[in-house]
Amino acid sequence: ANHVATVYCNGRELGTHKGGFSTFRYDLTPAMKESGNVLTVTVTNGVSDIYPQNADFTFYGGLYRDVNFIEVKDAHFDLLLDGTDAVFVTPHNVGKTRVDLFPVNAEGCTLHVELKDAEGNCVGTADTDAAAHSHVLIDVKNPHLWNGMEDPYLYSAEASIVCDGEVLDQVTVRYGYRSFHVCPNTGFWLNGKNVPLHGVARHQDRLDKGWAISKADHEEDIALIKELGANTIRLAHYQHDQYFYDLCDETGFVLWAEI
């Protein structure tokens, strides 16, 4: 919603979000009734003090990405944590995996994490008592590396809130094992190999659509950029749709992501 949006449920204001690119959520529960609920979003892209103030591209207005209604049990991974999944996977070193979890209303529950390879085989598990911020460490032996366009291999982390044998909520996050660094003399290195970067910059708009592009449009952009022979994409100049980041992970593009 670009770029100032106010959300109402049954006429009750839930909040105002400023900024047109990042995911945001509101809890509808206090304003809902048994039936006949009405969700209203007012959006303006008028001149304001919201970043960016000006740029060499058009600031389209309105609702231009997905709007989702998410229903969860009382115990769930925190949907109000800055629009995230509240499950974060960090491969600190190749094979050494930290998973940070942020549940709510999960006192007395267990957090169960299962890591799976691309074929769905379990490669590691861990459990911990639920807390506002919990984490587990899992060591995956000899992981299959995410290796850019040559081999964009992805694992998944399946995090669950379990209470009395019942799974109350579950979130799956995909990730890859890789190491990288940039050298001022030799450029970009991925998994110990020098990889020359050839790329393009990408905006999120289309003729006659503005920013309201479809998943098929995202997929076509990926295919066209790949056809050019590029292996790198600079996402100008804001957060893009999460779907596009996921496509890049799947395809093997190195991303320059601007915030």
Name each model feature, range by range.
Residues 1-80, 106, 118, 239-242, ...:
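Accessory beta-strand-rich segments of carbohydrate-active enzymes
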Residues 32-36, 102-184:
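Extended acidic/polar, glycine-enriched regions
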Residues 55, 89-91, 143-147:
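Outer-membrane beta-barrel proteins
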Residues 74-106:
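Surface beta-strand/loop "capping" patches
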Residues 20, 93-97, 130-134:
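Ser/Thr- and Asn-enriched, surface-exposed coil loops between beta-strands
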Residues 20, 60-63, 153, 169, ...:
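A short, structural micro-pattern
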Residues 1-9, 15-16, 70, 74-86, ...:
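Active-site-adjacent substrate/metal-binding segments within catalytic domains
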